[in-house]
């Protein structure tokens, strides 16, 4: 079976496709013990206006069709929900693997992740793996709409931290002299928080969403450490994995649940 090429996130995969609120953090769930952030009920702006998509495509030398999945921008109303403050790390995933005798990622040393990667987002997990973890933790995967609201708040901002790209706010590959070295610890970019205080939602590892755009496929949000353009690191950017059983070095996940 053909697997999605890692660089597809950065280009044609997209075609296939707040006001600051001081909010309390949610209680940890009993199974994975990790903090979740409350995202309040209400409307938010999802996607990108057609005129803005055209401007961005010209500015970043992309074909406008690559942004087609984001257009038109629309106002969506969502009920309150909670979302993990950070992506699921190798450390957290190891607890699940050992508790459930679940198959670990292939690059691990048996059921133990490489020690230097403990606090990095878990990768080499497909969407079924992500859902299995979420079920164990008493959670679920977020929808693309929930993910986007948690990332951009209600003011329609371009990036989780604002409308201007900040090279120090996320893990990326934007013209750096050295080749990208992979993921980073999920706490490595404190300047990258969203209006709600959700972290690491741009770059590092792209994240599986619950939506099914087509049979066997899935939406990805957040860009990744391989991203070579700010265009793919925006809150509204939407990638698509043609196969939701892909296990790749740039795809991870975080969980959500009802408030």
Residue spans of the language-model regions?
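LRR flanking "cap" motifs
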Residues: 66-73
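Short capping motifs at secondary-structure boundaries
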Residues: 81, 88, 94-106, 137-138
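C-terminal segment of N-terminal export signals and the immediately downstream linker at the start
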Residues: 21-38
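Functional-site microenvironments in short loops/helix caps that host divalent-cation chemistry
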Residues: 39, 45-54, 58-65, 103-249
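Short, structured beta-strand segments at or near domain termini in extracellular proteins/domains
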Residues: 249-259
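Residue-level signal for well-ordered alpha-helical scaffold segments within enzymatic catalytic domains
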Residues: 8, 12, 91, 95-98, ...
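N-terminal secretory signal peptides and thylakoid transit peptides that target proteins
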Residues: 1-20
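Well-ordered beta-strand positions in beta-sheet-rich domains
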Residues: 36, 43, 73-75, 80
């Amino acid at each position: 079976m053909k697997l999605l090429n890692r660089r597809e996130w950065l280009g044609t995969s997209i075609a296939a496709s707040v006001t600051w609120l001081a909010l309390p953090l949610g209680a940890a769930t009993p199974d994975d013990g990790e903090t979740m952030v409350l995202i309040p009920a209400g409307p938010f702006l999802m996607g990108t206006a057609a005129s803005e998509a055209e401007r961005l495509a010209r500015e970043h030398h992309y074909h406008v069709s690559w942004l087609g999945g984001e257009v038109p921008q629309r106002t969506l109303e969502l009920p309150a929900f909670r979302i993990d403050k950070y992506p699921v790390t190798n450390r957290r995933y190891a607890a699940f693997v050992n508790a459930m005798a679940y198959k670990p990622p292939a690059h691990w040393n048996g059921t133990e992740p490489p020690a230097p990667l403990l606090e990095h987002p878990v990768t080499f997990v497909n969407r079924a793996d992500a859902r299995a973890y979420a079920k164990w933790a008493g959670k679920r995967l977020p929808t693309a709409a929930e993910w986007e609201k948690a990332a951009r708040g209600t003011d329609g901002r371009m990036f989780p931290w604002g409308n201007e790209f900040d090279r120090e706010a996320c893990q990326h590959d934007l013209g750096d002299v050295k080749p990208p070295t992979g993921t980073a610890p999920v706490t490595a970019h404190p300047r990258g928080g969203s209006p709600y205080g959700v972290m690491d939602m741009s770059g590092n590892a792209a994240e599986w969403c619950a939506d099914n755009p087509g049979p066997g496929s899935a939406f990805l949000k957040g860009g990744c450490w391989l991203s070579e353009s700010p265009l793919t690191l925006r809150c509204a950017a939407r990638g698509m994995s043609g196969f939701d059983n892909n296990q790749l070095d740039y795809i991870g996940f975080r969980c959500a649940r009802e408030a």
